[in-house]
Amino acid sequence: MSLPHATYTGPKSTHEFEVDPSDPRYQTTEGRTTGASDYVLKQGHQDVDKPSDPKKVDNVNSKTGIDQYTTLSQLRMQLTGLQDDINEYLTEKINHVKKPRNSKQEQEINDLLDGSEET
């Protein structure tokens, strides 16, 4: 089975996302960047959209003793990790773009408060 992958193409950059099936982040259906926010959960709400656990093949690999998952469950787990990778990458890009803008806005506010802005 080939592994899923994704490519982000933006105006100034391209980024490849690839699955490493040995990495634990690609071995779960519970993503780090998906689901209800901590704020919502603290308010007592339950995550009704929580994904189901991956389905295991009925027989365990007797040589290794390691659980084997169905092909569809493997794909679900890999896509969950891939989605986390993409979400984290895009969040980092957004925050990187926001920083200079926020710094500039902060400077303008400080200038106004200090009275150094010409009227």
Swiss-Prot record:
A single Gene Ontology CC term: chromosome, telomeric region
Feature: compositional bias, Acidic residues: 108-119
UniProt feature, compositional bias: Basic and acidic residues: 44-58
A matching Pfam family: Gon7
Annotated keywords: Activator, Chromosome, Nucleus, Telomere, Transcription, Transcription regulation, tRNA processing
Alphabetical list of InterPro entries matching this protein: EKC/KEOPS_Gon7
Compartments it resides in: Nucleus; Chromosome, Telomere
Keyword ATP-binding: no
Record-level GO BP terms: tRNA processing
Primary location: nucleus
Ranges of biased composition (kind: Polar residues): 25-36
Region Disordered, residue ranges: 1-62, 97-119
Role: Component of the EKC/KEOPS complex that is required for the formation of a threonylcarbamoyl group on adenosine at position 37 (t(6)A37) in tRNAs that read codons beginning with adenine. The complex is probably involved in the transfer of the threonylcarbamoyl moiety of threonylcarbamoyl-AMP (TC-AMP) to the N6 group of A37. GON7 likely plays a supporting role to the catalytic subunit KAE1 in the complex. The EKC/KEOPS complex also promotes both telomere uncapping and telomere elongation. The complex is required for efficient recruitment of transcriptional coactivators.
Self-association state and partner proteins as the record states: Component of the EKC/KEOPS complex composed of at least BUD32, CGI121, GON7, KAE1 and PCC1; the whole complex dimerizes.
Family membership: Belongs to the GON7 family.
UniProt name for this protein: EKC/KEOPS complex subunit GON7
The species this protein was found in: Kluyveromyces lactis (strain ATCC 8585 / CBS 2359 / DSM 70799 / NBRC 1267 / NRRL Y-1140 / WM37) (Yeast)
Gene name of this polypeptide: GON7
